[in-house]
UniProtKB/Swiss-Prot annotation:
Gene that encodes the chain: adkA
GO cellular component, one term: cytoplasm
Protein name according to UniProt: Adenylate kinase
Keyword Cytoplasm among record annotations: yes
Protein source organism: Aeropyrum pernix (strain ATCC 700893 / DSM 11879 / JCM 9820 / NBRC 100138 / K1)
EC number: 2.7.4.3
Swiss-Prot/TrEMBL keywords: ATP-binding, Cytoplasm, Kinase, Nucleotide-binding, Transferase
Amino acid sequence: MRHPFKVVVVTGVPGVGKTTVIKELQGLAEKEGVKLHIVNFGSFMLDTAVKLGLVEDRDKIRTLPLRRQLELQREAAKRIVAEASKALGGDGVLIIDTHALVKTVAGYWPGLPKHVLDELKPDMIAVVEASPEEVAARQARDTTRYRVDIGGVEGVKRLMENARAASIASAIQYASTVAIVENREGEAAKAAEELLRLIKNL
């Protein structure tokens, strides 16, 4: 039911700041002697997609045909576990930066369906949240990413509600805990402290 190492899936809608929280978490964990191996699920999908000549950047992955995304998703999960097994052995925590729900050209798509969960076997699914207004503002400021299709404050609000529900639905399959971590503006370090506290209690 579980890997020798602990698995924590950190989710959040685009622009919520989960990657920033994870970076803060890494620094805190190092200070406290907690061994982490951090991966970005999208990077693993992108690597395979680029090699196959399907896309040039990660924001284009969600525009691919759904069945193609499914293949990339399955391959990413397998590669992540293989890498973590080598890096962590039987000790430490695998942190996976990903989305519980992705807005695609064919509708909302689960980031943590059964075939992915069967590979990852998460101990915890952490949902990083902020107010929809803050998230929409962060999206607007980030000119390095294409997020126009998310849909402004109302679009963010709907996506956040559905993503939280998707996280809980995914957690049921593996009896994973679900943790809601608030990432208020300028308080990523505080969010990381809370996340580390929860991880240490697993």
